[in-house]
Regions:
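Glycine-rich, basic loop-to-helix element that forms the pyrophosphate-binding segment
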Residues: 119-139
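Short aromatic/hydrophobic "clamp" motif used to bind/position activated sugar donors
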Residues: 144
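Catalytic donor/gating beta->alpha subdomain of glycosyltransferases that bind UDP-sugars
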Residues: 166, 172-195, 222-225, 229-276
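Acidic donor-binding segment of Leloir-type glycosyltransferases
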Residues: 76-121
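Cell-envelope/extracellular polymer assembly enzymes that use nucleotide-activated donors
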Residues: 56-59, 87
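N-terminal membrane-anchoring/stem segments of glycan-assembly enzymes
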Residues: 1-53
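Acidic donor-binding/catalytic loop of UDP-sugar-dependent glycosyltransferases
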Residues: 98, 148-164
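Short, well-formed alpha-helical segments that are part of the catalytic scaffolds
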Residues: 43-45, 67-80
Length: 276
């Protein structure tokens, strides 16, 4: 033991000015380990849903542009939710494919499906925020639940689970969305979205609301109206989810859920959800 200590002392003396670099590296390593442990604690901490006697109505809002096949494949999963009081609103963003025919066909089997349309000749045809605004104004219920048509809920209890996190002090709830773990050719994208979700959870803990995920998020219509929607930046196509959650954080708590029943699965065949 003494020999070891003496060798260490000699080695430390020979480092000279480099010893300060070693100290700095040691401090940085400890700081990194601390942040890793802190993130793991935050991610593992459970946010429990609220035990409600009465559940609120929910309006699911989905926008779609030339996605007839995605509508046919994924829309039934949104419509078959095990929830008593909900509707699904599809806003057709200037589609020129078979979108309208597909919606009419599906609507025959699901009366809770409501549709509205932005016609192709409108000058706002590429504004996502306009489509979201139209869907919000058409909604009957105060809780608005958003996703993309290149996604599908992982369970029949998606609506119920997301709604269960709302109380009078909740402004928004954000859930997890990712590619199916059985798909092998989207591993990098799946890891990116997983790490992104962890980062969002850490930011929420620190009251920082920088980016969000329009594939799986919910907020109250009343707060949206009070905030005047996207009036501050209505013409930008991207960032509709980020802008809104930042604004809504002024009205109440922003919650994130890791409940498996709240997960949304993204189609590997359509990567457009990555821009949100």
């Amino acid at each position: 033991m003494l020999i070891y200590m003496e060798s260490l002392r000699v080695f430390w003396g020979e480092l000279g000015a480099f010893r300060y670099g070693v100290i700095l590296l040691f401090v940085l390593t400890l700081t990194y380990i601390y942040h890793v442990i802190r993130r793991c604690v935050i991610v593992s901490r459970k946010v429990k849903p609220i035990d409600k006697q009465e559940h609120e109505g929910v309006s699911v809002i989905i926008t779609s542009h030339n996605n007839a096949e995605c509508l046919r494949r994924n829309l039934p999963s949104f419509l078959m939710q095990a929830y008593d009081n909900f509707e699904v609103i599809v806003v057709d963003e200037c589609s020129e494919d078979d979108t309208q025919d597909v919606l009419i066909e599906i609507q025959k089997d699901y009366p809770q499906l409501r549709c509205t349309r932005i016609f192709p000749d409108t000058k706002f045809r590429f504004t996502k925020k306009l489509a979201v605004n139209i869907g919000v104004l058409a909604a009957k219920h105060d809780i608005l639940l958003f996703s993309e048509i290149n996604c599908r809920p992982s369970s029949m209890y998606w609506v119920k689970t997301m709604e269960s996190y709302f109380d009078e002090n909740t402004a928004a709830v954000v859930g997890f969305a990712n590619y199916d773990f059985t798909e092998q050719n989207v591993r990098n994208l799946r890891m990116f979205r997983f790490l992104r979700f962890i980062k969002m959870m850490v930011m929420v803990k620190n009251k920082k609301y920088i980016f969000w995920d329009g594939c799986n998020m919910a907020y109250r219509k009343s707060y949206y109206i009070e905030n005047r929607g996207f009036a501050k930046n209505s013409q930008s196509y991207l960032g509709y989810d980020n802008d809104m959650v930042r604004e809504l954080s002024r009205f109440g708590a922003i919650k994130m859920t890791k409940d498996p029943s709240s997960y949304v699965i993204i189609d590997k065949s359509d990567k457009k959800g990555e821009i949100n």
